[in-house]
Amino acid sequence: MELAAEEGFDIEDVEGAIEEAGHGPLPVLAVVGRPNVGKSTLVNRIIGRREAVVEDKPGVTRDRVTYEAEWAGRRFKVVDTGGWEQDVLGIDASVAAQAEYAIEAADAVVFVVDAKVGATDTDEAVVRLLRKAGKPVVLCANKVDGPSGEADASYLWSLGLGEPQPVSALHGRGTGDMLDRVLEALPEAPAQTFGTAVGGPRRIALIGRPNVGKSSLLNKVAGEDRVVVNELAGTTRDPVDELIELGGVTWKFVDTAGIRKRVHLQQGADYYASLRTAAAVEKAEVAVILVDASESISVQDQRIVTMAVEAGRAIVVAYNKWDTLDEERRYYLEREIETELGQVAWAPRVNVSAQTGRHMEKLVPAIETALAGWETRVPTGRLNAFLGELAAAHPHPVRGGKQPRILFGTQAGTKPPRFVLFASGFIEAGYRRFIERRLREEFGFEGTPIHISVRVREKRGAKKK
């Protein structure tokens, strides 16, 4: 902190920046309810921008179903569970399915009901699901635009979920009071502590687009004699997590139901899969991304990779069906990996065959490598010596007659590694990427995303208003 003061930074600002970057995983809020009650409109209101899809139609493709939000200085993630229509599986089944996977990954739930329509049989079915899950619930009575609407909302006491929060998601009425209740229900984001041991078996999400061989791979690594526990935290229909022994160590594979139970839906299958993948990634520490090496790398493959990176998980990429490739396909696959999956060039890679079991023994070392990178901590003194040498050898380009300097830096957290750099001016994105590359060359960080945030020193003498 002495260095911060010498360089003209406000100590409180520095401490705040480090604390903000150093939090562990953010708490998760799921927004659930039947179609057309205004879930996506409410999500847009919560996150403060028009980003969620506002049509409740099955088959609407979304790159993301998880968004980051902030209220009263606290940050959290919002899972939007919109996107289902009555003719997907029958309304009860479709709502129960999408709600169940979101609730599984959530710390608290906002249950949205149309106050004008009142409680329906479908709403009652969701209430039963919420009671079974045991998660904190905030009941949102939406489409309340005035006193008559508040009277409608009061009827929702009958659901037995406590006081209904009268809200108009469209106009913003009542959303502040509702979010205050949400903060009461959500746990605080855990502070980051270096070297904290993770309780229980390490958690793995096996993810990938449909039909890449996830089921075959899971069966191959598990084997009936090696499944330690089959139904942990089971949902109403099928097991969610499985404990599997690999390399003499027990690992928890999360949401194996989504792998073992093949989903055959005429509509909404992509959305169903992406929601399920997002929920699995949220619960995991490491994502093993399975790619079908016999086919061209698809946009969906890239989306799944991006989802895991943005979630900040340790990552291993496994290329399945490797034994089926001829020399020509291997050549073109290498080119595709360079161009399409360059964003995870740092991730350990294993070439496997779920069918024959080829190279399965390489999976555990790759996972362990990724977790080690994910938990790597660089001492502050060593980090600043590295930054000083880097800036001396490769200074930031001059812009507008000025050359921004990195004054000092610190690692605010791990899982994934998060760094805060304090600078005399704006640091361009290209230079940040250069710093990340050199950090990886110097300290490893194999198998993990790295987050770098920059705080710029205010001009000396500038008064805060």
UniProtKB/Swiss-Prot annotation:
Domain EngA-type G stretches: 27-190, 202-375
Binding sites annotated in the UniProt record for GTP 2: 208-215, 255-259, 320-323
InterPro entries documented for this protein: AAA+_ATPase, G_ENGA, GTP-bd, GTPase_Der, KH_dom-like, KH_dom-like_a/b, P-loop_NTPase, Small_GTP-bd
Database matches in Pfam families: KH_dom-like, MMR_HSR1
Keyword GTP-binding part of the UniProt annotation: yes
Record-linked SMART domains: AAA (SM00382)
Top-level taxon of origin: Bacteria
Name of protein: GTPase Der
Gene this protein is translated from: der
